[in-house]
Amino acid sequence: CLVGSEMCIRDRRTLKFGFYTVILIEGHAEDFLYGRKYYDYSNASLIFLTPGESFKADKNKILSQKGWLLAFHPDLLYHTSLEANIKNYSFFYYKPEEALHLSLREKTKIIECLCNIGEELQHAIDCHTKTIISRYIELFLDYCTRYYERQFITRNEPNKLIINKTDLLWDEYVQSGKLMNGILPSAEYCARNLQLSPHYFSDLLKFETGKNIYEYFQQKRFETSKRMLSDKNNTTALVADKLGFSNVQYFSSLFKKITGVAPNEYRISQN
C-alpha cells in the first residue's frame, strides 16, 4: 500500500498502475477537468483506477496542481472484509471524465482518511497491520461512496436528461425490432450510446429510479405493451411478438397477473 502526498501532476504521458489507484487532484474554480461542470464543487477531484488501467492527464490543460495518490495491491485484500466488498465500489470502473468532485469539507475528510492510512504505514508491521490498513481503506471508500451519492443529487437535473435519453433509446430499440429476439437493452448498449461508462450509467439509473437496468426495462416493456394495446390495429399476438415475449400465451398470462385483466380485455376497454 502506498500513500503519496503533495503529488505534482505535470506529465502528459499515459500512466499505468498495477494497483487499485485513487488520484486526488486539487482544483480551482476555473478548471473544468475530468467531467466537472459549473454546478459541481471545485476544491478537488478524485479519479479511481483498477489494476492495469491507464490514465492520461487532461490534454486540454497542463496540470500543475498538487494532490495525493493512494495505491494498494489486490493481494492486500486477501482474507479481509474489503476483499468481499471491493466489488461494491463500482466507481473504480468509471471513466476519468466521471470523476468525483469534492467540496472543501469533503476534501478535508478525504485527506484525513489518507493521513490515517499513511500514519499506519509508518507503524512497525505486526499482526494487526493488514487489518487496520484495509479497514482504513474501506472507510475511505465508504466516504467516496457517500460523496458520489451527493454528486448524483447535485446533478439531479442533468441526470433527468440522461434518463429521458434512455427512454428515447428504448423507443428506438423497440421500433427497430431489436427487442423481437427477447433481449433487453444492456448497460453496455445504453452507456455506449450515451457516452458513459456502463457502471456509471447503472449507478445513475439505480439512484434516479430505484431500479437496476433489468427492472427498469421490464417496466418500460410493460408500459409499452399497454400503449400498443391501446391501438386497435395491434393484436395481442403482434404486441407479444414485437416486445420479444416467447409466445402469446406467456405474454397474456404475465399481463393478466400484473393488471388483473387479459390483454384482449384491456385492448377492448381502451377502444
What are these regions (language model features)?
Residues A44, Y189-L196, F201, L205, ...:
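Append "Primarily bacterial transcriptional regulators
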Residues I9-K95, D126:
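N-terminal regulatory/effector-sensing and dimerization cores
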Residues S252-N271:
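…primarily DNA-binding HTH/wHTH and HhH modules…
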Residues F92-E138, Y143, Y147:
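Amphipathic alpha-helical segments enriched in hydrophobic/aromatic residues interleaved with Lys/Arg
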Residues S134, N156-L194, Y216-N234:
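A short, Lys/Arg-enriched amphipathic alpha-helix from helix-turn-helix/homeodomain DNA-binding modules
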Residues C1-G4, C8-I9:
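Single conserved hydrophobic/aromatic residue that forms the stacking wall/gate
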Residues F207-Q249, I268-N271:
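Terminal helix-turn-helix DNA-binding modules in bacterial transcription factors
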